């Protein structure tokens, strides 16, 4: 039988794994995904037949395969799509080699590596079994142990790869980052594009809409129970996601479809804001409509601010083209695993390998399981998040940092996060020659910090320092003078921190916000006075005001009655055993609002401006494993919602105490710590 007539062999991926590990993993440092291994086994079985294991040409093929894979920069993970592309490239190169070489030389080209040779074609023609079934001891070759440092990465906002959401195809599409001869665009002063501004709201809207439609309450568009569905939806969320009755399914109507349907009930999804006349309106990509919230009952436990995307239920009135809202709520949240499954486990952050035009990185399920088990083993890893406003120009702060470093030096954490602002007054340009400028003083403060750190050998050598800028830090402070500026915020310029860089072995000057990829977890860190902003811009509903007024009057009456009865027991003074402290209720409102909106700044541009080109870096799709919102204006909290642990370490110095939070990734447990200064 000639070489082209060899029968293919069916190879089990598990039989090929030891050989592929020796060549691809051990020699070239590649990780083989399960689908990639199956595709590779199928190709080798068709090309080399039953003697694929004893043939030296199989090894040569894997060597060529690995070389082309690295040549094309396809990343560390070998998947099925990449295997198909590389094998096709091998065939194309073989054709080119055939055309350029004489006939005799062609026998030694790559064609011999993708077809059975005459040596084992004879075995097949003699009646050999075409299925490789010989057992192989897999214990002889074990999986390569994972190094946790390969899966630990601090991701700067301006270096984060960009995926845009294709509305028509309902999938993410990679956007290639352009670079200039002067350097990456993130380092250049440029004006955001108008296209990014126009796409900002529709992208966010459709992400929320698709998330809502994946909810079980919206799966049946034929049945709709108006004026009660919102209440039942809230009951479902409070009950932990139990399915609704068959009569409670809801459907979303576009605003443009309200015309001519006077007096009917509808459920709308849109962004709430004030229009040019100063009235509240609801907006979606199809249009905008004025809303009447005088009789609206919002669901409790969340903030409603201009810029939030909400579900509003009510009656359309053609008189004045108004929508009278009866109830309003935030879109139902979605767990991280459910979102990743819906988008095909895309590696949006490029943690397991950067994506490019010819290769899209995905999260391998087997690898995620291995990383999860590795997390459980690394029980000594700790992340320490300090409170915000570490004012280095304050002598009390230097004393507090010294006491903190004394404690951490005995057992250095894996990561130490220091949120700004790092000066009590904003940095501004000064031309006064009689006194040092604010920039010189700012540099001197970091030089003093470097001098302090030099006393702690273990800390500066074993810990990764992550600095997050605040409102008073350069260069944004020069334009906004300490007022909250545009998001995201650039890292602190390197000219101010040269001595800290020399002292610390591992230091990262992060943006605001910054993401940390740690094994199977994703952490989002942001420094923002979000609590005060929510309170200042919260929408006032007349029905809620009336309820609060009645509760206040009732409380006053009860207090007067209590004064008359001096022998009341403590159980009679407690109105509800389920009543939570105000700080707990406040923290839950903040966390639920942010995670339901799946955006770190769910405000309009008038409230908190955003750099249009980088709005995608503020999206929480999927929600992170852990979210750290450093907000000195809010109470310290540790809240878990939809599987996302949310932490606020509070203010760094409060009543002569140093505040910080210690997070253990192996247990996903946070502990609040204090040190008296």
UniProtKB/Swiss-Prot annotation:
Primary location: nucleus
Keywords attached to this entry: DNA replication, DNA-binding, Nucleus
Organism: Eremothecium gossypii (strain ATCC 10895 / CBS 109.51 / FGSC 9923 / NRRL Y-1056) (Yeast)
The keyword Nucleus belongs to this UniProt entry's keyword annotation: yes
Extra remark: In eukaryotes there are five DNA polymerases: alpha, beta, gamma, delta, and epsilon which are responsible for different reactions of DNA synthesis.
Role noted for this protein: As accessory component of the DNA polymerase epsilon (DNA polymerase II) participates in chromosomal DNA replication.
Protein family (similarity comment): Belongs to the DNA polymerase epsilon subunit B family.
InterPro entries given in the database record: DNA_pol_a/d/e_bsu, POLE2
GO cellular component, one term: epsilon DNA polymerase complex
One term of GO molecular function: DNA polymerase processivity factor activity
Subcellular location: Nucleus
Protein name (database record): DNA polymerase epsilon subunit B
Gene Ontology biological process terms in this record: DNA-templated DNA replication; DNA-templated DNA replication maintenance of fidelity; error-prone translesion synthesis
